[in-house]
Amino acid sequence: PEVIITPGERKKVHVGALVAGGGITGSALMRYLAEAGMKPVLINHDRGSSWRNIAGGRPNFSVPELSDIARHNHEIFKELQKISEVNYREIKYVTFAHDDVMMSQLEASLAWTDGEIVMPSDYAAKIAPGINPDLKKRYSAALLTNDCWQATPGKVIDLIRHLGVRAGGSVEEDSTVTGVSRNGREYNVIVQNHRGEYIE
């Protein structure tokens, strides 16, 4: 087994669950584990891609199962907006068909997606008045999808974490997981916190 040597004595803490990574996925996992009574600890190092994205979603996918997951995610965003202001708003999503294969996929997705095919002559009227007119030459059509949404990433993550902490979870910011080993049914995790201390 690998032995990790750290300076000084390591404080040892037993937790019900440990989540490494505090983006949208890790924060949501911490929230749901907390609501299940597991008293999880979320270890977050920095601000990753979840803080830089548009915090939105769309139900337009090439398979219906992914669209179904997206619709359920949309319901979660609506619930979050009812709890606190996350700048949630419904939008439309545009996917351009760059070849016949893509066009066939977009048309097929209408069986499980609320949207419409937009022809090049209607791009300005249905997508945006100032749209680049050269797109008419490049793309044979576009799919305009309804039931899409956006929200502010930081507000969404902060609210999700707040709900998790309120339910019994905790967050360790500016911390790093430096080692993980398995011990039977449990895991030993070594974390360096923001004070430079090592905790197991």
Task: Give residue spans per PLM region.
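Glycine-rich Rossmann-fold phosphate-binding loop(s) that bind the pyrophosphate
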Residues: 21-27
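Core beta-strand elements of the Rossmann-like FAD/NAD(P) dinucleotide-binding domain
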Residues: 12-15, 194-200
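Extreme N-terminal leader/targeting segments of oxidoreductases
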Residues: 1-17, 32-36
